[in-house]
A protein has these predicted regions:
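Immediate post-signal peptide segment of exported/extracytoplasmic ligand-binding proteins
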Residues: 36-52, 70-71, 175-180
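Short amphipathic alpha-helical coupling segments at ligand-binding clamshell hinges
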Residues: 65, 204, 208-211, 277-289, ...
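A ligand-binding cleft/hinge motif common to bilobed small-molecule-binding domains
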Residues: 110-115, 236-256
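A bilobed periplasmic-binding-protein/Venus flytrap-type ligand-binding module shared by bacterial periplasmic
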Residues: 153-160, 197-199, 267-278, 297
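An extracytoplasmic/periplasmic, membrane-proximal ligand-sensing/linker region
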Residues: 203-205, 306-334
Length: 334
């Protein structure tokens, strides 16, 4: 018995030593492998010399981001093209039909994902930065990762509506009090429709939007101009991106917002072209957008970053409320 215990102790000790050595090897070898991979990527990018970036993010913000990237990697030049979501998707598809594959990286709206996947226009790439991003915001097959998100919330003009009178739930928003041009809705808020279908089921979501439409809301495309009209008092309520409303609130405008739960959070994915002319530079830029540095730039723009170690400004933009993620790979937005 004594001998067995001693031998057992020896094996336990040996096992402990081997385990510790394994940990040491992992700690030493993995960073070395990552550095080697980074060095290979950078070397390849140097030979390519440029990256072509298509985006729907505003031109001033996109230009600032690409300028900072070029400072970090002075051997690369970024060619930037910016337009809206629909026109950008049309541009990519039209170019592909004509045999042109000019772009490397694209940031756009979630509804771009399926058309690009179906036409085999996206490359699969899992960025090492994705480990700092919620799994819901990273595609399992590597075709996209959320770059930033937008949450649809209810905003109001504080001069026209008292806080205690603001609807706090989706059902409260259906009160006949808000009938007749009292609510502003985006004509292209497909992500919100899809998100509530995901949360509630198709039948309940469609029934809800029919009841909302019966209130005769003010219909207009986009967010920025609609929020400006809210500030001007054109209507008392709006469903819009919280970041757009928050920018005006931070400037002292008479507007505020709250989340109707679950708030639908729309993904703005970053993707790499399957036939990227500069594949190494594309991956380097992709990693940069998702890095802590790249995500902190988004915070500076008052957009909503997706990294766990980068808080939005203010944090309430993506903290303190329940949300449901829009599925960029949804095939049925209606």
């Amino acid at each position: 018995m004594t001998t067995f215990r001693i031998e057992g102790g020896i094996w336990m000790a040996l096992g402990s030593i081997m385990w510790k050595r394994a940990i040491v090897l992992v700690v030493l070898i993995l960073p070395a492998l990552c550095c080697a991979q980074d060095a290979k990527l950078i070397e390849g990018a140097k030979k390519e010399g440029q990256v072509v970036y298509y985006t729907t993010m505003t031109l001033d913000q996109s230009k600032h981001t690409t300028d900072q990237f070029e400072k970090k990697y002075p051997f690369l030049k970024v060619t930037l093209f910016r337009t809206g979501g629909g026109p950008l998707l049309n541009k990519i598809l039209t170019e592909a039909r004509g045999g042109r594959f000019d772009w490397d990286v694209v940031v756009g709206r979630g509804e771009m994902v399926i058309p690009l996947i179906d036409r085999k226009l996206l490359a699969s790439y899992r960025s090492p930065e994705s480990k700092m991003i919620d799994a819901q915001l990273v595609d399992d097959e590597g075709y996209w990762t959320a770059y930033y998100v937008n949450s649809y919330v209810l905003g109001w003009n504080t001069k026209l509506v008292k806080r205690e009178d603001v609807p706090k739930t989706y059902d409260a928003l259906l009160n006949p009090r808000w009938k007749g041009g009292q609510i502003s809705l985006d004509t292209e808020a497909y992500g919100m429709v899809e998100g509530l279908k995901r949360a509630w089921g198709r039948e309940k979501a469609i029934a809800y939007f029919k009841r909302l439409a019966a209130l005769d809301p003010v219909l207009k495309r986009g967010n920025t101009e609609r929020v400006q009209l809210l500030v001007a008092g054109e209507y008392p309520l709006i469903i819009a991106y919280n970041q757009t409303i928050q920018r005006m609130t931070s400037r002292g405008a008479p507007v505020d917002w709250l989340a109707l739960e679950p708030a639908v959070t729309q993904v703005n994915p970053v993707m790499i072209a399957a036939k990227a002319p500069h594949p190494n530079a594309a991956r380097l830029f992709y990693d940069y957008l998702l890095s802590k540095e790249g995500q902190e730039q988004l915070r500076g723009y008052q957009r909503i970053p997706v990294r766990k170690d980068v808080e939005p400004d203010p944090p309430r933009l993506f903290r303190g409320f329940k949300y449901t993620i829009e599925n960029p790979e949804c095939r049925d937005y209606l």
